[in-house]
Design a protein with these regions (language model features):
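Conserved helicase motor core of P-loop NTPases
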Residues: 363, 367-569, 575-577
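Residue-level recognition of short, solvent-exposed, well-ordered loop/turn junctions
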Residues: 351, 562-565, 581, 630
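Pre-Walker A adenine-sensing motif
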Residues: 203-219, 513-514
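N-terminal accessory nucleic-acid engagement/regulatory domains that precede
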Residues: 3-16, 23-185
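N-terminal pre-Walker A segment at the start of P-loop NTPase domains
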Residues: 186-209
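Short, charged beta-turn/beta-strand-edge "cap" motif at the junction between a beta-strand
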Residues: 573-578, 644-646
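C-terminal accessory regions
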Residues: 531, 584-701
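ASCE P-loop NTPase helicase motor core
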Residues: 213-215, 219-453
Length: 701
């Protein structure tokens, strides 16, 4: 919209506002919404939804049109609903800051002419035929749903997300009924747990042993949520849980186990961790339990899209309630990345008697799409809230005492009886662990102190730097830390590999080289808070690529070509036909002689999967990636690049997630002082009704 149009809208508002007897007209409200869209405060999609409602029902009250646009905007930012009680006191907090006086005036004038009382908004919503009152009306396909309209916290939903949220709550409640999957020999279970978790003299697992408690809780139920920070042993615990289920199964040879994660990278890490842990445990238990056979039977971990059978071009899956998964135990890692719609589909596709184990860090970033399911499920995780019956069960089966501080003082929530929070980190200590803890606790001063005081170089702060200085972390790199120099060194081996692989019987040289390039690339990553701008993913990808071309590490034509040898890419759209999924990382490399055709190679566990570059349309260069996309990955050195003007994207969870991607070294790039403190003070809050739907479900143990 032009500046003249902005002024015309303001004049129209001023004329309306000058006569208090004239109510705000729907057409005027739509004009204001379009102005907010052109200001960047709303998306065109948001306004289009309100416009459709206005077109189909011209009598719709202006406040309903505004609520509809705001609801669409909230969903686009990861919320599953619009919390109406929070809308009136702080409307601008939902939109973000206005750009310029004209937009600020439109916002202020619009809000001044909308009903000041929540009751008036609710009355208008109830009067709209497009809105279903969840507690009163029959479902007639209305696109909007008003939930808890008579409570102090009413919420407005798009119909699809209301249905997903209700489905997840229903499935979770059903799985929390404590109906044993099988009869349990508690004495045998206790014996196996004692062998799987032998007492450690230094108390390395903590007191009580929450890993052991998690296994005991999982043994009796069809749902277990295991949360904890990095290094607390979530997959270590899950592997021992699998061994326990095998040892106590009536017919162990028929136990069907599946592993899954939201991304291919996370799935591969889950499988590797489970296999390694079970292999070590096999040596510990000897011939009494055949864990090697279990490893072979489990097979490869899969992405959730692959597991459920994503149908190309649709939001539907081939696995659902009418055609459930053929599985007895499903372990899902990186559950914080699972959005509301995916969780609903997953729960629907599970057989009622199957066990579901969710692993994840509740403090990480939630999924990009709507919902913060793991966070909602873990609302009581830190407090414990265990019933007396649950504490008795844990003591009987695991020999562990749950302290009174972790027991419920009143009615015990049912979900809490199926949730375990691992509290002792064995791997994630030192400055990186201290930094993550300070950020997670909202202590910006301590976080800065850790960054500035680390003598071993494991953490570092680049303050007041330029994008060029951030690029130097990638090439040539920070002293003593991984960078893309390792990846460039492996790329440079191609001429020798090409010559060797051309010889009969030495074709395996090419595959070994591809693996070495992929592994070297995964040692470092630039992580960005935003996508656009010099400090964003796009700008830094371009700058790193240019630096590598200038250094001779990439071919000279890389700057002008869509594809070149060495280009790392991230898949941005699921393509089951090609066997690639959103978030997969691959590198374009020459195929084995004599072809020499560029193909993108992906590591899928121990195997390599390749796709011709001409068939990959939905990819983006991946020298730098957003923190959201990095979830499920781990790098020897991770560099987190903050950006001014990031608004709500710059959050505590974003910084925590970036830090916890680092295994050995972490660098924070802060273009201007104060960005870290701003982020740490700003925790992410996702509007959702899932937690409320689960409250009040008491567990009887």
């Amino acid at each position: 919209m032009s500046r003249h149009a902005d002024t015309a809208t303001l004049d129209l508002f001023a004329d309306t506002a000058s006569d208090a007897a004239l109510p705000l007209k729907p057409a005027t409200a739509m004009a204001a919404l379009r102005t907010l869209t052109d200001a960047g405060l709303l998306r065109h999609l948001d306004t289009a939804l309100a416009a459709l409602l206005h077109q189909q029902a011209p009598e719709t009250a202006p406040c309903v049109l505004v609520a509809c646009a705001l609801l669409a905007q909230m969903e686009g930012r990861g919320h599953s609903c619009l919390p109406l009680a929070q809308l009136l006191p702080v409307p601008l907090a939902l939109l973000g800051p206005a750009e310029g006086e004209a937009q600020a005036s439109v916002l202020a004038t619009l809000w001044a002419q909308l009903p000041p009382r929540l009751a008036d908004w609710l009355a208008a919503l109830r009067a709209c035929r497009w809105v279903r009152q969840a507690e009163a009306d029959a479902d007639q396909g209305q696109p909007l749903v008003l939930a808890d309209g008579n409570s102090p916290q009413p919420r407005l939903y798009l119909r699809r997300y209301w249905q997903h949220e209700q489905a997840v709550a229903q499935y979770i409640r059903a799985r929390c009924q404590n109906e044993p999957v099988q009869a349990i020999d508690t004495a045998a279970a206790r014996g196996w747990l004692a062998r799987f978790f032998p007492a450690l003299p230094d108390g390395a697992r903590g007191t009580p042993d929450w890993q052991k408690i998690a296994c005991a809780l999982a043994l009796r139920g069809r749902l277990t949520v295991i949360t904890g920070g990095p290094g607390t042993g979530k997959t270590y615990t899950a592997a021992r849980l699998l061994a326990l289920l095998l040892a106590t199964a009536p017919q162990p040879e028929q136990l069907r186990v599946a592993l899954a994660a939201p991304t291919g990278k996370a799935a591969a890490r889950l499988k590797q961790s489970i296999d390694d842990t079970l292999g070590a445990l096999q040596a510990q238990v000897g011939a009494d339990l055949d864990l090697n056979a279990l490893v072979q039977r489990v097979g490869a971990a899969r992405t959730l899209h692959s597991l459920l059978g994503a149908r190309p071009g649709t939001r539907h899956f081939s696995r659902h309630a009418g055609r459930p998964l053929e599985v007895d135990v499903l372990i899902v890692d990186e559950a914080s990345m699972v959005h509301l719609e995916m969780m609903a589909a997953l729960l629907a596709a599970l057989p009622p008697g199957a066990r579901l184990v969710l692993l994840g860090d509740k403090d990480q970033l939630a999924s990009v799409e709507a919902g913060a399911v793991l966070g909602d499920l873990c609302q009581d995780a830190a407090a414990g809230c265990y019933s007396a019956a649950t504490a008795d069960w844990v003591a009987q089966v695991a020999g562990e005492a749950i302290a009174p501080a972790f027991q419920a003082r009143g009615e015990a929530p049912a979900l809490a009886q199926h949730t375990a929070m691992l509290r002792a980190s064995r791997r994630f200590g030192g400055p990186i662990g201290q930094l993550a803890q300070a950020v997670n606790q909202g202590d910006a001063a301590s976080a800065l102190a850790v960054l500035r005081a680390a003598a071993d170089g494991s953490v570092a702060l680049q303050q007041g730097s330029t994008p060029a200085q951030a690029v130097q972390l990638a090439w040539p790199g920070r002293a003593g830390c991984a960078s893309y120099a390792d990846y460039a060194q492996q790329l440079a081996r191609w001429p020798a590999v090409e010559q060797a692989a051309a010889e009969p019987g030495f074709e395996h040289f090419h595959a070994a080289w591809v693996r070495s390039v992929l592994q070297a690339f995964e040692r470092f990553r630039l992580l960005c808070a935003v996508r656009a701008g010099d400090w964003g993913m796009g700008g830094l990808n371009h700058a790193v690529q240019a630096a590598l071309v200038q250094a001779g590490a990439l071919p000279a034509h890389a700057a002008a070509s869509a594809w070149y040898a060495g280009r790392p890419v991230m898949v941005t759209r699921n393509d089951p036909l090609l066997g690639v999924f959103n978030g997969d990382i691959g590198i374009a490399l020459p195929s084995a002689p004599p072809g020499h055709l560029l193909r993108v190679y992906f590591a899928q566990g121990e195997a390599l999967h390749s796709v011709a570059v001409t068939r990959l349309a939905h990819v983006e260069t991946a020298f730098a990636m957003t923190v959201h996309k990095s979830q499920g990955s781990e790098f020897a050195h991770a560099a987190l690049v903050l950006a001014a003007g990031s608004g709500p994207l710059l959050s505590r969870e974003l910084v925590y997630t970036g830090i916890t991607r680092a295994r050995s070294a972490f660098t924070l790039v802060e273009p201007q002082p104060g960005l870290l403190a701003q982020a740490v003070r700003q925790p992410t809050e996702r509007a959702s009704g899932l937690a409320q739907a689960l409250v009040g479900q008491s567990g009887d143990g």
